[in-house]
């Protein structure tokens, strides 16, 4: 999880624009904000549905541990992540996900000190799970999250990921935790590991349900207030996209890993799913910009978009931003698995070149988004206190 807010306000360098400019469409800020709200609601619904499917598979694992039930639980974690990642474009403006009471810190905290939660190589008795003095409850695991340090992670996607895969000790693949870690009599504290996995998964589902309710239509909730914001809400939308582009994704998740070349700075290191994390975030940004979201059943939610709003002022700029965002998605999609092999080597190593291209595109798109905000009369992208 990103603790600091990164805000981008640089001038935009000129780039070539391919094709004819977008024809200006008649949309206003209110329409864009209303459609965004519908899009956020749908995306959180899908993230919740994916997590609920994972919860079902995890129940099957703890009830009947086997290679098959462990593989099925891992598969549902990977599938659910695809939908959650696209919601990260709704962060960084003090909305329900990450305001003072928001659950983001419980949902997606990283990097994680594995030994805070469970055993690791050389420390067979490490972690909360192996400390029988600590009662396993929802309240307790919330209190334990980040206690004593930001890497002391006890909740969320990455805690679940570690409990499903274990440490990633391979240079070519993900972690390989045995299903026997959940078999009483086969592994120490298997009963507590089962209870912990069940509890932490239930908390994730509850937190996602909280976000769905915050964006539910026709209720006295955050969405109702957001839809009254017009241009101020548009400002928040653009701030979320720009902050995710530059500070979080290009910065914390890619530049840091490139600089250290350390597996510990990989976002989803246990499952080797980091390459998909990058794609999901870039896709989420594009979803918001285009006002388009493809749901798991194939249905497409389409409506008034930021692109159309900007095109009403400057069609060429709207096309420029669209092309840059599409380039970021394409560059992210070219990153190969495992990510921890992509980041190592010299400057001209193929993997490092692929990641650097993604970083460069994200940095440029954050600048372009700043220019797009300016043509709408938005010049202050810092989060209001």
Per-region residue spans from a language model:
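Mature extracytoplasmic or organellar-lumen-exposed domains after removal of signal/transit peptides
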Residues: 26-385
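N-terminal export leaders
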Residues: 3-7
């Amino acid at each position: 999880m990103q603790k600091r807010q990164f805000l981008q306000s640089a001038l935009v360098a000129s780039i070539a624009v391919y094709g004819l400019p977008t024809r200006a469409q008649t949309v206003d800020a209110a329409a864009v904000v209303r459609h965004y709200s519908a899009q956020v609601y749908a995306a959180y619904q899908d993230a919740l549905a994916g997590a609920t499917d994972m919860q079902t598979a995890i129940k099957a694992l703890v009830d009947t541990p086997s290679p098959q039930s462990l593989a099925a639980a891992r598969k549902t974690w990977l599938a659910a992540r695809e939908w959650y990642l696209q919601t990260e474009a709704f962060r960084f403006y003090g909305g329900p996900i990450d305001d003072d009471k928001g659950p983001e810190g419980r949902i997606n905290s990283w990097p994680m000190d594995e030994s805070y939660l469970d055993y690791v190589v050389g420390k067979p008795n490490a972690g909360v799970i192996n400390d029988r003095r600590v009662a396993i409850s929802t309240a307790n695991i919330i209190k334990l999250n980040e206690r004593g340090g930001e890497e002391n992670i006890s909740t969320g996607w990455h805690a679940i990921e570690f409990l499903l895969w274990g440490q990633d000790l391979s240079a070519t693949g993900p972690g390989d935790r045995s299903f026997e870690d959940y078999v009483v009599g086969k592994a120490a504290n298997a009963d507590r590991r089962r209870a912990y996995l069940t509890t932490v998964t239930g908390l994730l589902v509850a937190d996602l349900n909280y976000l769905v309710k915050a964006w539910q239509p026709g209720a006295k909730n955050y969405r109702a207030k957001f839809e009254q914001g017009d241009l101020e809400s548009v400002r928040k939308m653009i701030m979320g996209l720009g902050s995710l582009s530059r500070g979080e994704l290009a910065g914390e998740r890619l530049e840091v890993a490139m600089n250290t070349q350390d597996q510990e700075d990989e976002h989803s290191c246990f499952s080797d799913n980091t390459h998909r994390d990058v794609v999901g975030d870039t896709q989420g940004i594009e979803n918001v910009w285009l006002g388009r979201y493809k749901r798991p059943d194939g249905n497409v939610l389409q409506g008034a978009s930021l692109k159309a709003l900007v095109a009403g002022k400057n069609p060429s700029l709207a096309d420029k931003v669209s092309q840059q965002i599409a380039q970021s998605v394409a560059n992210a999609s070219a990153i190969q698995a495992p990510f921890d092999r992509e980041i190592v080597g010299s400057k001209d190593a193929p993997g490092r070149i692929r990641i650097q291209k993604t970083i460069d595109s994200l940095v440029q798109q954050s600048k372009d988004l700043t220019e797009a905000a300016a043509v709408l009369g938005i010049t202050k992208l810092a989060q209001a206190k």
